[in-house]
């Protein structure tokens, strides 16, 4: 049985890919393909099952992971994933597709661990990363943390992780082999017109099913007008400690109203020249 693993990283259209897989899950199953996950489509359990240290994040909180039960949860996730894979094999399916953007944050030791574990269960494994221009990815992150995490600074190019694409790809190539890495390009990062879902289908060898799968209409997290983002940021300034607690329903509704007040994103979020120069010096 073969496995295709989409690894993100974040802010590269993962929710769109997962929406496509979820919508077409039954049709894929009829064709011998399993969209594998435990609960939600983002499959964060897989990332935590092979992480080396506990980190308190929104994802870990949603899965009930604490510093006290961390090792117990890791083992539980591995057992549940292993059982699910065994069940898929027993059903006679020939291929598994996984979309887990959290895997994009794994370090070398963690990638080696998941590789060893996966190759005990699959004959062939292909890794699908999505590559996006660093400035576009940083702008997307800025809009996300203003809207959802109470970000205060008017700093458009947010690159807190100093993400290095070459290092990222080399990690996975060194462990899974260069021929098994099938990168695709995010549409806003290349001059030619591209379709993320069609490119994902090509990388995961689903193109032959394009006549029976629903391909269009899966773009999620549409671009938000820059004016809406700035209004949200200024509201955040009224409560500068909001990032310390989860966003409540009232704030979510307010941000939704602000976002919907601009029918089409005419104003883009753009960094200053100095901010752009400082950003590019890190790459």
Annotated model-derived regions:
Residues 1-283:
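Anion-recognition interface
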């Amino acid at each position: 049985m073969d496995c295709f693993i989409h690894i993100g990283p974040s802010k590269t259209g993962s929710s769109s890919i997962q929406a496509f897989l979820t919508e077409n899950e039954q049709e894929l199953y009829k064709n011998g393909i399993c969209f594998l996950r435990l609960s939600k489509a983002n499959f964060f359990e897989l990332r935590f099952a092979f992480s080396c240290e506990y980190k308190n994040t929104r994802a870990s909180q949603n899965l009930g992971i604490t510093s006290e039960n961390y090792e117990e949860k890791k083992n539980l996730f591995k057992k549940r994933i292993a059982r699910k894979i065994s069940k898929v094999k027993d059903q006679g399916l020939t291929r598994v597709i996984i979309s887990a953007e959290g895997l994009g944050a794994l370090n070398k030791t963690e990638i080696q661990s998941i590789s060893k574990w996966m190759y005990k269960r699959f004959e062939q494994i292909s890794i699908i990363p999505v590559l996006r221009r660093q400035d576009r990815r940083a702008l997307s992150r800025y809009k996300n943390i203003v809207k959802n995490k109470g970000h205060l600074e008017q700093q458009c190019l947010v690159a807190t992780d100093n993400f290095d694409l070459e290092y990222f790809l080399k990690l996975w190539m060194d462990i899974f082999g260069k021929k098994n890495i099938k990168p695709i390009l995010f549409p806003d990062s290349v001059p030619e017109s591209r379709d993320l879902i069609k490119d994902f289908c090509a990388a995961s060898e689903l193109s032959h099913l394009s006549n029976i799968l629903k391909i269009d209409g899966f773009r999620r997290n549409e671009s938000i007008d820059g004016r809406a983002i700035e209004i949200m940021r200024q509201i955040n300034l009224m409560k500068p400690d909001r990032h310390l607690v989860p966003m409540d329903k009232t704030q979510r509704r307010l941000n939704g109203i602000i976002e919907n007040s601009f029918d089409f994103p005419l104003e883009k979020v753009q960094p200053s020249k100095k901010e752009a120069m400082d950003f590019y010096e890190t790459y």
